């Protein structure tokens, strides 16, 4: 106990800040207290340190297991992707081989349908031209007929006098009368 009291008393007397030196007094450095503290730390700290190391070990092992599982999943996905790639490459080769003949067939179909469309348009154009020509001819005929009729009426009007006009009307009435008797 005396030792303990002396320790507290000596704590109050610190060496001055200006001095520095080695303390060669073994009893003053208190190696027994230090060894006791180290012994207690080792005895009780071993369990805590062991638990910390075990926890760390478990986390590392679980991380490794997760990594292995992820690696396995990645390898599986890689194999699936390679299989899909092989399948797509085979389909692409098929399309390439079949595609050329399909393209040629489509090209010929397109050329044939374009030729038929052009032929149909040419026929439609010819029919339209014929229709327009016929309409123009009919308009010219109608115009010529109207002009001829107007000239004939003009000639008749200039040649007819009242007496000739009355005789023509009487002759026409007579013809209508005989026609009526024949039909009755």
Curated annotation (Swiss-Prot):
Superkingdom of source: Eukaryota
Bilayer topology term: Single-pass membrane protein
Keywords associated with the record: ATP synthesis, CF(0), Chloroplast, Hydrogen ion transport, Ion transport, Membrane, Plastid, Thylakoid, Transmembrane, Transmembrane helix, Transport
GO terms under cellular component: chloroplast thylakoid membrane; proton-transporting ATP synthase complex
Membrane-spanning ranges: 27-49
Molecular functions (GO terms): proton-transporting ATP synthase activity, rotational mechanism
Location of this chain's protein in the cell: Plastid, Chloroplast thylakoid membrane
Signal sequence segment: none
InterPro entries found in the cross-reference section: ATP_synth_b/b'su_bac/chlpt (IPR002146)
Presence of keyword Thylakoid: yes
Family: Belongs to the ATPase B chain family.
Function per UniProt: F(1)F(0) ATP synthase produces ATP from ADP in the presence of a proton or sodium gradient. F-type ATPases consist of two structural domains, F(1) containing the extramembraneous catalytic core and F(0) containing the membrane proton channel, linked together by a central stalk and a peripheral stalk. During catalysis, ATP synthesis in the catalytic domain of F(1) is coupled via a rotary mechanism of the central stalk subunits to proton translocation.
Miscellaneous notes: In plastids the F-type ATPase is also known as CF(1)CF(0).
Assembly notes: F-type ATPases have 2 components, F(1) - the catalytic core - and F(0) - the membrane proton channel. F(1) has five subunits: alpha(3), beta(3), gamma(1), delta(1), epsilon(1). F(0) has four main subunits: a(1), b(1), b'(1) and c(10-14). The alpha and beta chains form an alternating ring which encloses part of the gamma chain. F(1) is attached to F(0) by a central stalk formed by the gamma and epsilon chains, while a peripheral stalk is formed by the delta, b and b' chains.
UniProt name for this protein: ATP synthase subunit b, chloroplastic
Taxonomic lineage: Eukaryota, Viridiplantae, Streptophyta, Embryophyta, Tracheophyta
